[in-house]
């Protein structure tokens, strides 16, 4: 990000969406991929994707804490999945309450969130996953990425006013 407090993505962050997003307590999500300069993701004969070393998958989570106030939109966390030489690394950054900065979590954490939706107020524990928890879902069996896959990307996305099939746009 060029400005953490403003949530301004850097120019090399390519946004993408998924066809079947996972539910995370009503959190809004923004997804990005960063590829090393001159590198591409390739499709293998079995339909899976091969990511070059240095690829970074980014997912940011935010939540509207009070549906009466747009100003209550709060960034909660950003997760990074980084392609290394032999495997993937997982990193969760938890934003401070004001969203101006984020801290790398060494372990998982929980935070009680108070959310008002449709005149109903509820408090629930929001969970920030540890590296081990990330690796549980993002295993070799799931190709490490649950979202950046052919079946999830084969749909349209709005690229700053240009609506295009993601597989075409990302090619």
Question: Residue spans of the language-model regions?
Answer:
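Sequence context surrounding c-type heme c attachment/ligation sites in exported
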Residues: 67-171
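N-terminal post-signal-peptidase region of extra-cytosolic proteins
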Residues: 37-45
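N-terminal pre-domain segments of enzymes
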Residues: 1-35
